[in-house]
Amino acid sequence: MKKVSFDFDGTLDKKHIQQFAIELINSGVDVYVNTTRFKKFDNSDLFEVVNSLGLSSDKVNFTNHTWKAEFFEDNNLEFEWHLDDNYEEFFHFRRLKSKTKVIQVNSGNWKQKCIRLLNL
């Protein structure tokens, strides 16, 4: 099963991104949420979205303000792609030569890139 990753703030908190995530889930793609948030704080808004997508809490990773590329590497996580709005995250994915492709959600063709990488 193909695995993909979504940032939350500025990405999966948007309705049209949530709709895309639902389409992927319905196509059999394994969807994860990776956020730089701290787990110890109130994340009710995040879990409201996660629950609405039908995802279990084990599909959510809190990096506690560690760069996601470093978190992925340290935890042996690999995804087909990670969708994010933070330009600094892109720098770190490239610096570490991550196998996970990172896609900028603010680019005009982010959805097409995601679909192409999944061969859907």
Regions found by a protein language model. Name each.
Residues 1-5, 117-120:
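N-terminal intrinsically disordered, low-complexity tails enriched in polar/charged
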Residues 43-120:
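C-terminal cap/substrate-recognition subdomain and adjoining C-terminal extension
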Residues 2-69:
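Alpha-helical substrate-recognition element adjacent to the catalytic core
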